[in-house]
Amino acid sequence: MEHRVPHKMPHTMLLHGLGQSSDSWKQVIDCLPTEQKEELHTPDLFALSEEISYEGLYRGWEQSCQKLPGRLHLCGLSLGAVLALDYTIRHPQRVESLVLIAGQYRSPKFLLSVQSLLFSLMPASNFAQLGISKEQMLRLNRSMIPLDLSRQLSTVRCPVLLLCGEQDKVNRKASEQMLHLLPNARKREVAGAAHEVNLQAPQQLAKELSAFWESLPKSSDL
C-alpha cells in the first residue's frame, strides 16, 4: 500500500518594515493555517547586523538565510520587501516565491528625504523600542537613497505576489510598475489598509498569503 508523505512547506521568511519589529507579524501568523507556520521565521532585522545601514542589514539577514536548507518563501513589507527582492535577484536559485507588500524597487528619494527630516525632529526615545539609536536610523535612511534594482527585475523568474493597501497611495504606483516589469507577477490590493498592512489588516493579509502559497506548484527542496 502506498503511503503519501504530506507536502512540507519550504522555510518561509516574514521581513518587517522600517519602524517595525518581528512582533509586527504576530497577528498575521495567528491567522495562518497550522501547516503554514511550521517553518516560519520572523527575524528582527536590526538584531542581525552591527552596522545599521542598508547593506549592513542585507548582509546580516543574508547570512541567516544561508543557514537554512532548501528553497525559501520570502515575504517582506516596505524595507523588508526591498531586502527580499534584492536577495531574490542575488540568489535566484534559493527563492521559491516572493511576496512584496508596499514594496519599492527604486528608492523614492524625495520621500526618504522627508522621512529623514521627520526622524531628525523626533526624540531619541522613539527609536529605543527598535533597539537602535536615532543616528543609526538616520544613517539607514540615507544609505537607502542610492538603491535602484530596476535593471535586475527582469531576472526574477519565481512567482511574485504584489500586495498594497488600498489606501497606500505612495506605493501603489511602484506596485503597478513592478506588475509589468516582473515576468511572473500578480497584484492584489488589501481592503481597509494603508502602508502597514500586517498591522492594519492582519486577517486579510493572512488570507492573501495562504491562498498564494497554496496556489504554487509543489516542488521538492534543493
How should these model regions be labeled?
Residues 125-151, 167:
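Hydrophobic, aromatic-rich cap/lid helix
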Residues 19-27:
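Serine-hydrolase catalytic-loop signature spanning alpha/beta hydrolases and amidase-signature enzymes
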